[in-house]
Regions:
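C-terminal interaction segments
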Residues: 131, 135-138, 142
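A general structural signal for well-ordered alpha-helical segments in protein cores
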Residues: 1, 111-115, 141
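Residues within well-ordered alpha-helical secondary structure of globular protein domains
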Residues: 3, 123, 140-143
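Rossmann-like dinucleotide-binding domain that binds NAD(P)(H)
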Residues: 1-39, 44-50, 56, 69-70, ...
């Protein structure tokens, strides 16, 4: 998500609930705010009865979803949104256009990642997600953990 955003969040909030064991959250809701105005909402749960790995992006012109559990249509792009009407202030016209799904390889992501890592070790090339990427992810995870421990108080990243 950080790569897609092109920036790190400036604020992270998390709230969770422990149902099975005290101190270990089974369900967590997160909110990330970015300097550009971008926001991300996450729902994380190992306890949820439905296994989901879905990512939704809502943009000003189109929307897209990535669903890793889907076999045929992992990515779906929606030409859907709202266009501002200039007849009067604050009016919007709903726009709903085409929906399409580009063909995406059905290879297992972990296999691709491991193969790429081994190739980089052998060739000396830099991996697509190197140590800097890992540091950025851990920084966000630590901020979310701090927020979780402080009852969803916003934590600087």
């Amino acid at each position: 998500m950080l790569r897609l955003a092109g920036e790190e969040p400036i604020e992270a909030r998390a709230v969770g609930e422990s149902y099975m064991r005290d101190g270990v959250e089974d369900v967590v809701f997160c909110y990330l705010r970015f300097a550009s105005g971008l926001a991300a909402h996450l729902h994380l749960s190992w306890l949820d009865p439905h296994k989901e790995r879905r990512f939704t992006v809502v943009g000003s012109k189109r929307m897209a979803t990535f669903d890793d559990m889907e076999l045929e249509r992992k990515v779906t792009v929606y030409d859907k949104g709202f266009d501002q009407s200039y007849r009067s202030y604050g009016e919007y016209i709903a726009r709903s256009g085409d929906i399409w799904s580009p063909r995406i390889s059905n290879e297992e992501p972990l296999r691709i990642e491991c193969t790429h890592f081994v190739e980089c070790v052998r060739s000396g090339e830099q991996p697509r997600s190197g140590p800097e990427s890992g540091v950025r992810v851990v920084r966000v995870l630590e901020a979310l953990q701090r927020s979780l421990e402080e009852s969803a108080r916003a934590a600087a990243v």
